[in-house]
């Protein structure tokens, strides 16, 4: 009887802890013949999704903070953090991310003609004292003490050109690229 009670207690503890927290590992081939590993953590209680892309010098961490309405992406080989106000028409809700992950795992190559182009500019010197309450603590932990770049969605994409873009894994499926040398 003691074993049954202990088993039920352990099952209850682990069941409660994993209730609002999901972790997915995705390994996919990269363009240079290696592999890209992604770890996607969906926290339904905090209303966030954290995507870690492990790809050598192109490794990055991206936080989708649905509670505060911001996306922050940090390419780990660069000393910069890119912040974008979430556009709910182009960014799927948190509960749909699991479906996108399933599609990514089920389909090796998925092409979408819909892209969201974003232009990033350094935050002005007047905004050095960032209101972290507005952006939320997950983004503060990712981006504090490094230069910040504010993103804005580019509506007119006819004149857009990119010198170099980082678009990998789940971010690529969502149509999000981090680009340098954008001409608008």
UniProtKB/Swiss-Prot annotation:
<keyword id="KW-1015">Disulfide bond</keyword>
<feature type="disulfide bond">
    <location>
        <begin position="81"/>
        <end position="143"/>
    </location>
</feature>
<dbReference type="Pfam" id="PF04089">
    <property type="entry name" value="BRICHOS"/>
</dbReference>
<keyword id="KW-0964">Secreted</keyword>
<dbReference type="GO" id="GO:0002283">
    <property type="term" value="P:neutrophil activation involved in immune response"/>
</dbReference>
<keyword id="KW-0732">Signal</keyword>
<dbReference type="GO" id="GO:0005615">
    <property type="term" value="C:extracellular space"/>
</dbReference>
<dbReference type="InterPro" id="IPR007084">
    <property type="entry name" value="BRICHOS_dom"/>
</dbReference>
<comment type="subunit">
    <text>Interacts with TFF2. Heterodimer with TFF1; disulfide linked.</text>
</comment>
<dbReference type="GO" id="GO:0042127">
    <property type="term" value="P:regulation of cell population proliferation"/>
</dbReference>
<dbReference type="GO" id="GO:0009617">
    <property type="term" value="P:response to bacterium"/>
</dbReference>
<dbReference type="GO" id="GO:0051414">
    <property type="term" value="P:response to cortisol"/>
</dbReference>
<dbReference type="GO" id="GO:0010467">
    <property type="term" value="P:gene expression"/>
</dbReference>
<dbReference type="InterPro" id="IPR051772">
    <property type="entry name" value="Gastrokine"/>
</dbReference>
<feature type="domain" description="BRICHOS">
    <location>
        <begin position="54"/>
        <end position="151"/>
    </location>
</feature>
<dbReference type="GO" id="GO:0009611">
    <property type="term" value="P:response to wounding"/>
</dbReference>
<dbReference type="GO" id="GO:0045178">
    <property type="term" value="C:basal part of cell"/>
</dbReference>
<dbReference type="GO" id="GO:0044546">
    <property type="term" value="P:NLRP3 inflammasome complex assembly"/>
</dbReference>
<feature type="signal peptide">
    <location>
        <begin position="1"/>
        <end position="20"/>
    </location>
</feature>
<protein>
    <recommendedName>
        <fullName>Gastrokine-2</fullName>
    </recommendedName>
</protein>
